[in-house]
Amino acid sequence: MCKRRKNPYKGLSNFVGGKIEENENGLDAAYRELEEETTISRNDIILSHLMDFTYHLGNCYLEVYVGKLNRAINVSGDENELYWTTLDNDFFDVTKYAGEGNIGHIMMHVKMYQEELLK
C-alpha cells in the first residue's frame, strides 16, 4: 500500500497504480507501474486480473490486478510512502483508505478468492 502525498486522497492509504500508456495493455501497465512505484518486477510476482470498474460520468476505466510475491522484498519508491499491510484491516474505513470504500470492496473480493488468486 502507499500513503498518498498528493491530492486526491492526500494522507490516505491507497493501492499503487497509474495510467495505461498508448500501445500498452492493462496487464503490462500494471507490471510497469508496480515496478516504477515499488521496485517489484515481473520476476518477483505474477499478477492476475481481479476486476474492473467503469465510471461512465467521469470517463474513467479502472483495471484491478492482484498477485502474491514469490520472495520477500523490501519495497522502495519516491512517489509515496510504501508499506505492507495484512488482509484483516478495515479497508472500508474512509478516514484511512482512499476511494470512498472501493479499496474495501476490492479487498473483500481478494479475501473471498484468496486461495485461487494467491496460490
Placement of each model-derived feature along the sequence:
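Structured beta->alpha junctions
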Residues: 5, 19, 51-54
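Short loop segments at secondary-structure junctions
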Residues: 5, 68-72, 87-89
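The catalytic Nudix box helix
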Residues: 15-49
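N-terminal strand-loop-strand
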Residues: 1-14, 42, 68
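Active-site segment of metal-dependent pyrophosphate-handling enzymes
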Residues: 39-73
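Flexible, glycine-rich phosphate/dinucleotide-binding loops
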Residues: 8, 22, 73
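Nudix hydrolase/Nudix homology domain
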Residues: 8-12, 76-119
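Conserved hydrophobic/aromatic beta-strand scaffold that supports enzyme active sites
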Residues: 1, 64-66, 84
